[in-house]
Amino acid sequence: MEPLLASSPVTSDANSRNGAGDLCSSKEGSERLKLSGDLESSETSSGDLSSEYVLLQLRIFRINLAVTALAVLVSILFVDLNAAISLLLGAFSGIIYLRLLAKNIGSLGKSSSSVGKAQLIVPAALVLVVAKVPELHLLPSLVGFLLYKPSLIIQFLLEPYAQKKSG
Amino acid sequence: MDSITTAASVVAAGLAVGLGAIGPGIGQGSAAQGAVEGIARQPEAEGKIRGTLLLSFAFMESLTIYGLVVALVLLFANPFAG
């Protein structure tokens, strides 16, 4: 029974280092331990929750980059360079828009009670820029902007695999 | 661009944004309400709720963006201008 023998001295050592071994002897001490354990577990779980949301954003960002690269490559090959540049500009705007939206949703219930509308400036600015610059096309830039939608769908489809991998 | 086309474009742009924002606005409000209630009831599911909310908000808000884009195109890159 080597694993059992190896594990028990380590825990007792850790307890004695924290002074928890002495606390366990009294009733008060065990209550304190319970409280500190609860606090630790709640801190850990809140940390996990926020990191889960951050990881989700990171996954969406990576998928968005991959979809953008694929779409730009296809448009360079089959359309023209100006369309590809418009698509890239639109995709970049889409990433910024989604980042702002995620930031607003992240602060919902914490620092604000409603989701802000600041992210809507991004598509408006995109359309204005594309309308002013004659080399850029409107339709490819809008398609590029909406590339975040397939990214979200792909992320949603791949989520069970990601959970299996992490869990 | 003649004056009738200009006036019609401005009115259409206003209607596109205004009418296009009604539905998503109501939907986003109820979705946010449900999400905040869900987080309050089950704080351990906060990450998943926020993720689902991000997904649903992104899809709902695109309806507003369609209206916004139509309005901006009518105002700044009008295809019906002479």
Swiss-Prot record, chain B:
Transmembrane segments: 7-27, 57-77
UniProt subcellular location: Cellular thylakoid membrane
Keyword terms, alphabetized: ATP synthesis, CF(0), Hydrogen ion transport, Ion transport, Lipid-binding, Membrane, Thylakoid, Transmembrane, Transmembrane helix, Transport
Membrane topology (UniProt): Multi-pass membrane protein
Pfam families: ATP-synt_C
GO CC terms, sorted: plasma membrane-derived thylakoid membrane; proton-transporting ATP synthase complex; proton-transporting two-sector ATPase complex, proton-transporting domain
Record site: Reversibly protonated during proton transport: 61
Molecular function as annotated in GO: lipid binding; proton-transporting ATP synthase activity, rotational mechanism
UniProt cross-references to CDD domains, sorted A to Z: ATP-synt_Fo_c_ATPH
Principal place of residence: membrane
HAMAP family registered for this protein in UniProt: ATP_synth_c_bact
Family of the protein in this entry: Belongs to the ATPase C chain family.
Subunit structure: F-type ATPases have 2 components, F(1) - the catalytic core - and F(0) - the membrane proton channel. F(1) has five subunits: alpha(3), beta(3), gamma(1), delta(1), epsilon(1). F(0) has four main subunits: a(1), b(1), b'(1) and c(10-14). The alpha and beta chains form an alternating ring which encloses part of the gamma chain. F(1) is attached to F(0) by a central stalk formed by the gamma and epsilon chains, while a peripheral stalk is formed by the delta, b and b' chains.
Summary of the function given for this chain in its UniProt record: F(1)F(0) ATP synthase produces ATP from ADP in the presence of a proton or sodium gradient. F-type ATPases consist of two structural domains, F(1) containing the extramembraneous catalytic core and F(0) containing the membrane proton channel, linked together by a central stalk and a peripheral stalk. During catalysis, ATP synthesis in the catalytic domain of F(1) is coupled via a rotary mechanism of the central stalk subunits to proton translocation. Key component of the F(0) channel; it plays a direct role in translocation across the membrane. A homomeric c-ring of between 10-14 subunits forms the central stalk rotor element with the F(1) delta and epsilon subunits.
NCBIfam families documented for this protein: ATP_synt_c (TIGR01260), PRK07354.1 (NF005608)
Protein name: ATP synthase subunit c
